[in-house]
């Protein structure tokens, strides 16, 4: 597969402070982005949702829907290259299946389209060990991740069972909410991307985040990672810092029941190496930063007349996010922030936690078995290494998460 190109190379540090972001006003349907691949993604999602709006929703999905795809090749020398490349290809995998999944996750196609096409997605400084790069939609509701062709194949392998599982649990799960999978081709560069619901809030800033696997071998953030404004910390960091998750017994019971069910499903599919992503919002800290930002904004008043605060750009219809009633500090809409849990009343700090399973597309194949054998030789048979078999992995994962809650 060709290198991901600029989609991940122009990465900016994400700010933990709740600064009001500004962007230059952009008319609807321009799809202007700094990266031509992002422009093509915006164009493609817009095209796809428009096409699907004319297709009748079937009573049930058919086996062929899980193999289907739609693709389009555009050769148009009249395009303004400042907005769009003149030659590109866009492919969407299993469009009917992902439309059905969006519906089951309570996501309206029009809202999905607006979030991904109104303004360019924002780069995110998170980077997976695999080299995958991330963007978030401008309104922070969705995450766009580059994936490999092997990931696409694995997604096809599990999609039917994943869909059935989502049907059975009525969309109530800690698993990634897969919402669309696409291939983009521009100037000989080919990349694959998958869109999921953001684990974190579009409104409540996260000041600390952890990627937890239940393993202790080589599970500490590097010095380079820790130097970031919002580093992704790991299991040993969580333990060594004495970090705690303060949720009440009822929320803990509900969370662990969902987690157990989800992880058993992953083990059945022989999937492993997934993580629990944990984000922590500090309510008082966020309030203080909001006050500081408002004071700074007051000083900068009138300096940038050509920009508009984040939200609905001009010349476009209202967004459901911005039309909802204002929420108090630390409050959230559970229909949007589906992974959010409040701390209990006696917690030392008022916090909101965002917790969900991520990175589920690693199958326990020969490659992982070889890695496990090599790590066992290096660290010893009893070491808590991450490449154990799926049943061992799921048990250790559940034990660790149950222990830290």
UniProtKB/Swiss-Prot annotation:
Compositional bias of kind Acidic residues: 289-304
Record has Nucleotide-binding as a keyword: yes
Record-linked InterPro entries: PInositol-4-P-4/5-kinase_C_sf, PInositol-4-P-4/5-kinase_core, PInositol-4-P-5-kinase_N, PInositol-4/5-P-5/4-kinase
Enzymatic class: transferase
Record-linked SUPFAM superfamilies: SAICAR synthase-like
Domain PIPK: residue ranges: 33-405
PANTHER family (alphabetical): PHOSPHATIDYLINOSITOL 5-PHOSPHATE 4-KINASE TYPE-2 ALPHA (PTHR23086:SF21), PHOSPHATIDYLINOSITOL-4-PHOSPHATE 5-KINASE (PTHR23086)
Identification of the protein by name: Phosphatidylinositol 5-phosphate 4-kinase type-2 alpha
Source species: Mus musculus
UniProt gene name: Pip4k2a
